[in-house]
């Protein structure tokens, strides 16, 4: 459960969680934008490609957050195993799948209040507090966005544009910190 002071939740938790999700969405999109379309499906050995990871995130978010409070988060129409099959799709198809998941997530988050955090949802037949489901999804999503960034950076080689504080520039950043809050970070990524 999330921190409480008396009976009140500290701060507007749902807004903070939504801001963190927006930050990871922007981070993933900024990484994907640096990858040639042909390289989106590139794999090394048994690893997943960027395309597979993006497809999985889109499917996971859409399943979890469609009818979030009223239906099991593992929808009968979702085929999780299929999400991990190698695929060659256009950038537009890939981003459409990605966006469908994020739209479901942000739609669900927009309808929540902090009071809803104490409610339960069901995922794979098991009850889970809304707050726990949101934090679990945020951790899951950030894990996979990290994979996307790593693969994109690896594929870009010397042509990579840093999405955070560039190597060797921490002191300069600390003199004029930008992007410390999720909304600021999103705005900075969108300017690149």
Regions found by a protein language model. Name each.
Residues 4-5:
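Basic polycationic patches enriched in arginine
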Residues 14-15:
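N-terminal leader segment of winged-helix/HTH proteins
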Residues 18-22, 26-32, 37-83, 123-192:
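Short, contiguous alpha-helical
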Residues 67, 72-108:
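Helix-adjacent hinge/juxtasegments
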Residues 110-113:
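A short N-terminal helical cap/helix-turn-helix that marks the beginning
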Residues 119:
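Active-site-proximal loop and beta-strand segments within enzyme catalytic domains
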């Amino acid at each position: 459960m999330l921190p409480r002071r008396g009976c009140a939740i500290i701060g507007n938790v749902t807004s903070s969680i939504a801001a963190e999700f927006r930050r990871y969405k922007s981070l993933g999109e900024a990484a994907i934008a640096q990858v040639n379309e042909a390289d989106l499906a590139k794999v090394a050995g048994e690893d997943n490609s960027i395309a597979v990871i993006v497809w999985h995130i889109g499917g996971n978010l859409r399943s979890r957050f469609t009818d979030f409070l009223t239906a099991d988060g593992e929808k009968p129409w979702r085929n999780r195993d299929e999400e991990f099959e190698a695929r060659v799709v256009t950038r537009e198809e890939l981003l459409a799948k990605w966006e469908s998941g994020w739209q479901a997530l942000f739609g669900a988050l927009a309808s929540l209040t902090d009071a809803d955090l104490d409610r339960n949802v069901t995922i794979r037949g098991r009850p889970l507090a809304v707050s726990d489901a949101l934090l679990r999804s945020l951790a899951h999503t950030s894990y996979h966005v990290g994979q996307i960034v790593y693969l994109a950076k690896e594929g870009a080689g010397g042509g990579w544009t840093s999405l955070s504080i560039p190597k060797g520039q921490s002191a300069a950043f600390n003199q004029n910190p930008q992007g410390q809050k999720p909304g600021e970070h999103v705005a900075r990524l969108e300017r690149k």
